[in-house]
Structures are given as C-alpha cells and as structure tokens.
Amino acid sequence: MHLYLIGIGSNQPHPVIGTPNRIIPQAVAALEMDDIDVFAHSATIQSSPMGPSSRRFANAAAVVATELEPPALLARLHDIESHFGRVRRGQSWRARVLDLDILLWSGGMWAGSKPELSIPHPGLRSRSFVLTPAAMVAPDWRDPVSGLNIRHLQSRFNRAKALDQSPHHH
C-alpha cells in the first residue's frame, strides 16, 4: 500500500458545481474510489494566481492510500480532472476547473520516463499555496530532496513574510 500527498487546486467555476470553493470538496469526494482511500484532507485556502491569470485559486491537499504506482495514479488524477471539465493544453498557469498533482509519496523520489511525473512535485518547496494545506494533513512528511518536513518548509514562508512586513528603520 502506498500513501500519496495530493495537491488540489481550482480557479475557474464549474457550470454545475459552481465556484472553486465548491469544486474542492467535490474533487476530494471524486478521489475516493474502490482502490483509492482518502485518509485525510485539508481545509480549503485561498491564494493569488500565478502568471497573468487574474482568478484567485482555491487550494487544498489530501492524503490517499492505494496500491497504484505513480504513473497509474497520475492517469487516474487526469481522468478526474477531465471529468470536471479540465482541458490540458496551453500554459500551465491558465485558469482551470481542477488541478490534481502528486506532491509526495511514501516511496520517496520518482523520476519516470514522462516529464509530467516527478516526485516530489517540482513546485513543492517553492509554493506556499501548496505547503499550507499540505501542512494541515501531512506536517511530518519529509521532502526527500531537502530532507525537511512539510511543516519546516511551510514555516520558511511564514518567517519570510513576517520579515517583509516589519517596519524598516534607517
């Protein structure tokens, strides 16, 4: 049995489900299948868009257990995205109804033959909108590249933000 940390994001409304805040819980429910168990999921947070998109994101994270290897789970995640109306083309930062990413897994690092599958996820250490919900459900999971756990990676963002907001004395 493998454990996976899944990043969940949305910044485009669905014609039936509604706003990104409503899409996230539906996406968590969609992850629960015969061969995938959702152990935990975070609260939904709001984040600013990356790139030129103007829509704010709703983000969350989930821990799932499955016998599936990373490529098979990624294919399943892409199927769920498609079911929600995601079209995979163009820029990675463009608006999307649903984005599901494998962030970490219990098997350590994974570098498959396909460039879209690399574990840990390349953006894991540099994106607070990924780390904040991840820290809610998997604070002690270690990033195999840096050796730091999710809580430590996430706290680096909070510390930097606090420093930036302090008054400047000359």
Predicted feature descriptions by range:
Residues 50-56, 71-74, 79-170:
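Flexible, gly/pro- and Lys/Arg-enriched active-site loops
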Residues 10, 62-66, 106-107:
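Short beta-strand-to-loop capping motifs
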Residues 31, 35, 39, 81-84, ...:
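Short amphipathic alpha-helical segments enriched in hydrophobics
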Residues 4, 60, 127-128:
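Small-molecule pocket liners
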Residues 1-36, 42-46:
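N-terminal beta1-alpha1 ligand-phosphate binding loop
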